[in-house]
Regions:
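Sec-dependent, cleavable N-terminal signal peptides
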Residues: 1-24
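Mature extracytoplasmic or otherwise solvent-exposed domains
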Residues: 24-179
């Protein structure tokens, strides 16, 4: 009788431990919107309460630059056939930034893209490059900071024709949860 009771309690304890470990990560969801600076994603991340070392959010974006080349005398000329630019940025979300419900705010910004004057299509590298990027694609990836394991990936397509000086319209085209 004791052996049977011990076996039942052991199985129950094991199931309880497995359930709490599996649910530690929760059902990770990310919602938000894009805005401009370089490219910025602001939103809310949920289901990350069990990540004791925090999580990292990485934003990678690709776009078409419109380039203006300026020489030392101040004369300007458009760049010729500049290549697409890709840039990224990270935000580390510390455990203390995650509330008791497993929710955290997200504000991740890509670095400013850089093109040399020559790559931008300017006559020489002595010219100064200024550019506006019309974003076409964005990827947001959430990883476990302790293990580097990918938890969530969202892929967006951005509409350059809807971009203004301060806003951009990006549509979620796919979402993959890895946990």
């Amino acid at each position: 009788m004791k052996r049977k009771l011990f076996s039942i309690l052991s199985v129950f304890l094991l199931l309880t431990m497995l359930t709490s470990t599996v649910s530690a990560g929760g059902n990770i969801k990310l919602s938000g919107a894009f805005r401009l600076g370089s490219l910025i994603f602001d939103g809310t991340l949920t289901g990350v309460g069990g990540y004791t070392e925090g999580v990292t959010v990485t934003l990678t974006a690709t776009g078409n630059p419109v380039v203006t080349c300026t020489n030392q005398g101040g004369s300007q000329a458009p760049g010729q056939n500049p290549p697409k630019v890709t840039t990224s940025g990270n935000q580390f979300i510390e455990p203390s930034d995650i509330d008791e419900k497993g929710k955290a705010g997200v504000s991740v910004e890509t670095d400013e893209p850089v093109l040399t004057a020559k790559r931008a299509g300017c006559p020489s590298n002595r010219w100064t490059v200024s550019m506006v990027v019309y974003w076409t694609d964005a990827n947001v990836v959430v990883t476990d900071s302790a293990t580097g394991v990918r938890l969530l990936e969202q892929v967006y397509t951005c509409d350059p024709t809807q971009q203004t000086a301060t806003s951009v319209s990006c549509t979620l085209v796919s979402e993959t949860s890895f946990h």
